[in-house]
From Swiss-Prot:
Binding, a divalent metal cation 2: 169, 201, 230
GO BP annotation list: catabolic process
Keyword Transmembrane: no
Keyword Metal-binding: yes
SUPFAM superfamilies in UniProt: Metallo-dependent hydrolases
Name under which the protein is recorded: Phosphotriesterase-related protein
Cofactor section: a divalent metal cation
Pfam families: PTE
MF-aspect GO terms: hydrolase activity, acting on ester bonds; zinc ion binding
Entry-linked InterPro entries: AryldialkylPase_Zn-BS, Metal_Hydrolase, Phosphotriesterase
E.C. number: 3.1.-.-
Cofactor remark: Binds 2 divalent metal cations per subunit.
List of residues binding a divalent metal cation 1: 22, 24, 169, 298
Amino acid sequence: MSTVQTVLGTITPNLLGRTLTHEHVALDFEHFYRPPPPDFECELKAKISMSTLGYVRLYPYSSKENVRFYDGEALEAAKKDVLLYKKHGGGSIVENSSYGLKRNLEFIVELAKSTGVHFIAGTGHYIHAMQDASHASLSVEQMSDLYSKDIITGLQVNGKMVKCGFIGEVASVYPIHDFEKNAIKAAGEIQEVLGCGVSMHPHRVTKAPFEIMRLYLEAGGRADKCVMSHLDRTIFDIDELLEFAKLGCYIQYDLFGTECSFYQLNTSVDMISDGQRIDNLIKLIKEGLVDKLLMSHDIHTKHRLTSYGGHGYHHIHTNILPRMFDRGVTLEQVEQMTVTNPANWLAFDP
């Protein structure tokens, strides 16, 4: 029987409830720090406060405090928001911190125990530039062995074995680095063997998701067990997105709550708004793709947590879904995207 592998053990898919499929509760994002504009250097070097928050929202990657999503203050704020998520009907969170992002499995396990929210942890590799020496030269075979071990055997956390429940996020730049090609191929190989879900992080160019899927499918991975993340900042043309959808993977809009059009990590494009995300999802629903859609926030900086003036993990449930209902999306369609699709993606028979 297919089950979902959480950090506290296996559960049946029907117990997941509403699920956020791409989040982080602790990670190190300092690699993406950008020097602040000279005019705002003082404000962005200061501690985040009401007087500096406006600058941080415009230049989130220019505040070192903001990208240090791993210190005690960040963990306390993340726990508060997971509890708010639970309060507002949240059931499960898929934690996408992989090798290179310094995932904190001990904290994830503690959150699962203390909040009652199901957490599914990922294995896999982030971009090559963020790997330490022990991982930077791994072969496809070595990666495959590692991913399989993390899922089948688990990792030791405080004397107990904690198993990962999917492969992800598997991240790449563009052109895709050889190390990252190995990670994509290893994910495809292990997916074919174990049947588990996979989550991909494409670079910020339209060609990247297509190339990732080619490598993954050629390695044996199933399209219907693969999520392509961050498509709301990658493929902006709806016809091109429909063309990509023909490959059969899940289409994930996972930057809900990111409302600043100026996108520091790709200044050549404007980040779309939540209203535009809703409009695009409705277009995809009308094209018959509701069974391939997923939603999340990809919280990875402090300023998106409520303790720092942000929206928290409950934003989709409390703010986005009501707006979708107002625009004609049905409860059945919302349940498909937030409950059924995540369960179908995560369930496998290890």
